Amino acid sequence: RWSKDDFFLALTQGVAPGGRHLYPAMPYTSYKGMSRQDADDIYAYLMTRPAVDVAITANEMPFPFNQRMALIGWNLLFRSQDPLPASSQGSSSQWQRGRYLADVLGHCGECHTPRGALGQMDLGKPMQGGDLGRFMAPDITPHGLAQRGWTPQDVSRFLGTGLAPQGSAFSEMHMVVDLSTRHLTPEDHQALALYLMGEQPPAAVPVKMGQGSDAGRMTYLDQCAGCHAREGEGKPHVAPAMRDNATLRQADGKNLIVSVLDGLPAQ
């Protein structure tokens, strides 16, 4: 049985009892800023959960990545590096609370910050978007959010419900909302939105109407309009609106293309 000290060391340093090094898929490089009180509170909650008898699966990583001793070198390089720089400007207590929620407890940068050659977060590009393989975690800097039409009010609503005029949460972000952010208080939703957008948020950029093409229009009407409606207004709780959809406004279009090709499971 792990003690509170064992748990805190694993969370913030990536070291399990017996000196076993955890892979940084467990985001201890973000959790290293966690307060001892918050860690102890999490531990206390976990101790109220019934035990589950589940065998630990074997490490299936290929050589040399299955050698945990290599993590000693990785940790020397990156565990003690500076915290992720703030992605917005602010100084109020609410902004500070939002930063703690985003950068530490929520570890948003682990997905939304680009990675370096050795898998470390690129501290020079905080929250500027990360490659998740099939999907991209979008840029959630104030500029990036505003370019896709987000406002602080919409960000706060999205974190609480997974819904906003800019679209609905899907894939990994749906799990984040469902298992995490929707359980926060409205005050914490507002603090997160304040931090992500900054204390002087940039104005949301309106959608610029393009010329389009007759072929694209006919394809949309034939394949998409049945759910998303003829003018892209969507149907509540059935299909999101397309007019102001943030996924449509991402520069590379990858997430839109993957969503069309793969579809999205019901969530």
Language-model-detected regions and their locations in the chain:
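Sec-exported extracytoplasmic/periplasmic mature domains
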Residues: 12-16, 31, 44-51, 103-106, ...
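Short acidic, glycine/Ser/Thr-rich loop/turn "cap" segments at secondary-structure junctions
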Residues: 22-31, 80-86
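Short amphipathic alpha-helical linker/capping segments at the junctions of internal repeats
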Residues: 28, 61-66, 175-181, 209-215
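Flexible gly/pro/ser-rich segments immediately N-terminal to CXXCH heme-c attachment motifs
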Residues: 31-33, 102, 145, 178-184, ...
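Sequence/structural segment immediately N-terminal to covalent heme-attachment motifs in c-type
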Residues: 73-76, 85-116, 121-129, 210-237, ...
